[in-house]
């Protein structure tokens, strides 16, 4: 249950959700919440059996406001289950115990029938950090790292517009095909105006190699564009996730909202397996910042062959379904934790299917 009041808003951290401090003083990693949506290509109602076992509620929530105190609103989520630790399941399977030839037969049957929904990001993290000016103009190594983590077409776009930073910024922040002037005015006069003004200054410093004031810059933009090649030929893939929309937003509510916003799914299109404990991924970004991603497991309820047209085309490049092997191949080698999470989810479901489904 969520409570939202003017008093509590001042004392709840929008990152970790705890009271007593605000985001700028939070010592926890920057935290996002997401959904790992799984589809089982079944013939024996396996998806329904798993939902009956590990899911207790629908993915809905309601807002209740007080007439006497309209500044107070209460969010009641009927998919949020009061934790009973004795009945919560953990993704702690590290192997599949084969008890008979029938188990091996089931393994061969199910191993490629478990599919994972994954999304690719429209913009690479390297491109995002560069456009936002998250670098030191004199730190050649860090800028090389950003360009190595860009997509090839992003570097070409920077080269094409290298004398017009505002064109690059407009391309990056134009969500709704608004006129360029409106978008740029909102950027340079809005909440993050200082950030993008500083980013533009840095960009122009890298560009203007003839300016005597830039003598402390060892390498200029032309060098990075011409000589630094991306490490990866294909986009990075992961699971839908995002950060809290407001301080009082519950973890699972945030995960569901972000999942629905990014994929275009409706609440009836998936079921959160809320009797399974969420799984955490911890990592340090290329910018040296610590991050934590908390994922809830869900079972898909809709046709995976239907075209998804309502997803967030600003943030998401593509949405696809992959087998375990295909998904592992699309996760970058340095994302060891993400591979571990995928493997634990896969083994948990595979174990349950092998030892609890009778399809002989």
From Swiss-Prot:
Single GO term (MF): bis(5'-nucleosyl)-tetraphosphatase (asymmetrical) activity
EC number annotated for this UniProt entry: 3.1.3.-, 3.6.1.52
Zinc finger (CCHC-type): 11-28
Domain Nudix hydrolase: 163-347
Motif (Nudix box): 242-264
Cofactor section: Mg(2+); Mn(2+)
UniProt keyword annotation of Cytoplasm present: no
Its job: Might function as a decapping enzyme required for the removal of the 5'-end m7GpppN cap tethered to viral and host mRNAs to allow their decay in cells. In addition to the mRNA cap, probably also efficiently hydrolyzes diphosphoinositol polyphosphates.
Name this polypeptide is given: Putative mRNA-decapping protein
Organism for this UniProt entry: Acanthamoeba polyphaga mimivirus (APMV)
């Amino acid at each position: 249950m969520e409570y939202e009041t003017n008093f509590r808003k001042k004392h709840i951290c929008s990152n970790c959700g705890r009271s007593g401090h605000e985001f700028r003083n939070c010592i926890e990693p920057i935290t996002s919440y997401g959904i790992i949506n799984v589809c089982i290509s079944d013939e024996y109602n396996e998806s329904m059996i798993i939902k009956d076992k590990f899911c207790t509620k629908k993915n809905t929530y309601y807002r209740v406001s007080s007439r006497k105190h309209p500044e107070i609103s209460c969010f009641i989520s009927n998919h949020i289950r009061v934790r009973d630790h004795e009945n919560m399941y953990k993704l702690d399977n590290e192997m599949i115990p084969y008890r008979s030839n029938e188990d091996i037969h089931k393994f061969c049957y199910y191993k490629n029938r478990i599919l994972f929904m994954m999304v690719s990001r429209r913009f690479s993290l390297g491109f995002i950090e560069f456009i936002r000016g998250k670098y030191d103009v004199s730190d050649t190594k860090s800028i090389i790292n950003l360009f190595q983590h860009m997509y090839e077409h992003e570097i070409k776009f920077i080269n094409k517009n290298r004398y017009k930073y505002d064109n690059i910024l407009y391309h990056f922040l134009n969500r709704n095909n608004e006129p360029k002037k409106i978008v740029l005015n909102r950027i340079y006069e809005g909440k993050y105006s200082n950030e993008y003004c500083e980013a533009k200054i840095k960009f122009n410093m890298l560009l203007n190699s003839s300016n005597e004031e830039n003598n402390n810059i060892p390498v200029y933009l032309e060098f990075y564009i011409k000589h630094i090649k991306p490490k990866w030929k294909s986009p990075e893939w992961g699971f839908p996730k995002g950060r809290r929309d407001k301080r009082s937003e519950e973890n699972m509510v945030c995960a569901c909202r972000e999942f629905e916003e990014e994929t275009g799914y409706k609440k009836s299109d998936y079921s959160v397996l809320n009797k399974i404990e969420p799984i955490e991924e911890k990592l340090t970004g290329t910018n040296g910042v610590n991050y934590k991603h908390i994922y809830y497991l869900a079972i898909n309820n809709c046709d995976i062959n239907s075209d998804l047209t309502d997803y967030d085309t600003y943030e998401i490049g593509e949405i696809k379904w992959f087998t375990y092997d295909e998904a592992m191949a699309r996760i970058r080698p340095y994302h060891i934790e993400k591979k571990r999470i995928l493997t634990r989810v896969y083994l948990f479901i595979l174990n349950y299917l092998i030892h609890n489904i009778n399809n002989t």
